[in-house]
């Protein structure tokens, strides 16, 4: 009896910041892997999400948003990570937002014109478009920009047409052995996922108050005798004022962040979590490439 064929390949998800790439990845995987937040520029690492369904294994590369501004070291590195994700993939999903088209979208498009892989255009947040009459002409405009494999209007938030994207992905996976066991959903360590969860909560609860000069180091991640994990997280900010902001009045803010992060960790790790958080000022880290390397920002470049 002949063995069943298997299919496996890499799929890059690209687009300018804040168009819904991480939400789309989470929806395609059926669970939360990449951090989502209303702030642009929240994805800093190329998180690999793995989705295995029968003979098909799609390995998703979730890029940081490619963006025009490259002044700070962290932004240069994020752009470099996003650009290097476009090479060596079987398929690219280019995510744009509703009827908006910006210079940043144009820049991503220009990079994709050189890509060898076919490109699916996912027009996200179509449910938010107020003037529905504007949608068709905009889709026609997009279709004229390059030869897309397909153009799919989606809502990553509600899941509308995400299955259509998944079906196109399956169709274009080459015949190959699976790279990962079928129960894998990401190749990132639990320590890394813990830091991402804390960072998401910082973005969520501090919103526009806090600039991007915040990162999280996991200083301790150990199993305990209760069958759970003891995790110590260090939140690094650039200025004393930001430290006060993260801690909040009488520690209220950091307490909320800790409670919410712990809930998500327990759900992800399927085990009890004891989480402790500290805040420390480390000035200039977002401008210093050496500091970024020490924080693991360039481990995959």
Curated annotation (Swiss-Prot):
Binding sites annotated in the UniProt record for GTP: 15-22, 62-66, 124-127
Region (G4): 124-127
Ranges for domain KH type-2: 206-283
GO biological process: ribosomal small subunit assembly
Record region (G2): 41-45
UniProt membrane topology term: Peripheral membrane protein
Start and end residues of each stretch annotated as G5: 154-156
Main location: cytoplasm
Keywords for the protein's UniProt record, in alphabetical order: Cell inner membrane, Cell membrane, Cytoplasm, GTP-binding, Membrane, Nucleotide-binding, Ribosome biogenesis, RNA-binding, rRNA-binding
Start and end residues of each stretch annotated as G3: 62-65
Annotated localization: Cytoplasm; Cell inner membrane
InterPro entries in UniProt: G_ERA_dom (IPR030388), GTP-bd (IPR006073), GTPase_Era-like (IPR005662), KH_dom-like_a/b (IPR015946), KH_dom_type_2 (IPR004044), KH_sf_prok-type (IPR009019), P-loop_NTPase (IPR027417), Small_GTP-bd (IPR005225)
Region G1, residue ranges: 15-22
Chain's role: An essential GTPase that binds both GDP and GTP, with rapid nucleotide exchange. Plays a role in 16S rRNA processing and 30S ribosomal subunit biogenesis and possibly also in cell cycle regulation and energy metabolism.
NCBIfam families associated with the record: era, PRK00089.1, small_GTP
HAMAP family: GTPase_Era (MF_00367)
Subunit: Monomer.
Protein name (Swiss-Prot/TrEMBL): GTPase Era
Species this protein is from: Klebsiella pneumoniae subsp. pneumoniae (strain ATCC 700721 / MGH 78578)
């Amino acid at each position: 009896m002949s063995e069943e064929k298997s299919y496996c390949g890499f799929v890059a998800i690209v687009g300018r910041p804040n168009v819904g790439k991480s939400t789309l990845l989470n929806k395609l995987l059926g669970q939360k892997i990449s951090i989502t937040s209303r702030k642009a520029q929240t994805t800093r690492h190329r998180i690999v999400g793995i989705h295995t369904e029968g003979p098909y294994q799609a390995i998703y590369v979730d890029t940081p948003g490619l963006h025009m501004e490259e002044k700070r070291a962290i932004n240069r590195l994020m752009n470099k990570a996003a650009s290097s994700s476009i090479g060596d993939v079987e398929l690219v999903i280019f995510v744009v937002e509703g009827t908006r088209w910006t210079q940043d979208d144009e820049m991503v498009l220009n990079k994709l014109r050189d890509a060898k892989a076919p490109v699916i255009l996912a027009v996200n947040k179509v449910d938010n478009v107020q003037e529905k009459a504007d949608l068709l002409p905009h889709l026609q405009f997009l279709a004229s920009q390059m030869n897309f494999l397909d153009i799919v209007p989606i809502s990553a938030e509600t899941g509308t047409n995400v299955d259509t994207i998944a079906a196109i992905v399956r169709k274009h996976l080459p015949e190959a052995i699976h790279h990962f066991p079928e129960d894998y959903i990401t190749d990132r360590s639990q320590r890394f996922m813990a830091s991402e969860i804390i960072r998401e909560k910082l973005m969520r609860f501090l919103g526009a108050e806090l600039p991007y000069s915040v990162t999280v180091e996991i200083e301790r991640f150990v199993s305990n005798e209760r069958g759970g994990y003891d995790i110590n997280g260090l939140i690094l900010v650039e200025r004393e004022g930001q430290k006060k902001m993260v801690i909040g009045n009488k520690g209220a803010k950091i307490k909320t962040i800790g409670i919410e992060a712990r809930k998500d960790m327990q759900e992800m790790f399927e085990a009890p979590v004891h989480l402790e958080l500290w805040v420390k000022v480390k000035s200039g880290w977002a401008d210093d490439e050496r500091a970024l390397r020490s924080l693991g920002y360039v481990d995959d470049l």
